[in-house]
Amino acid sequence: GPANLVTAARTAKQFLTFVNGGPFQPATAVGLRLPDSYFEGLRVGLQATRDRLCDVLTDIGFTVFTPEASYFATVDIRPIDPSGDGYEFCRRLPAKAGVVAVPNEVFYARPHYGRHMVRFAYCKQMHVINAAADALVKGFAS
């Protein structure tokens, strides 16, 4: 196959060798046959849900780090929660706004570096993002 695709698949494979990657092989084959328009549709859809979520988070008052490529938008909670405790913020968030976030500190070797950051997923359908946006606005209206 094309050298760039083989290299990419081989690189991914080296990080998957600790699990059985059998199910990924047919999925990869199908994906390689999909038209570019499929991936363009994914890009456009993810950009729209990202922008909607990031706009709402910004309007609420978070410092938002809008990603160029990801499924997650990271925010600094300190403008909203001066304690900067992302873990506790994420524990309270479902009761406050009916949505969840993940504290970024769990991804750090030195958790205190990410303590004030949390991430929200935007890899959802737009109606789900809209419902979450409404819930966040309502939850932080006070």
Cite the ranges covered by each PLM segment:
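PLP-dependent class I/II
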Residues: G1-S142
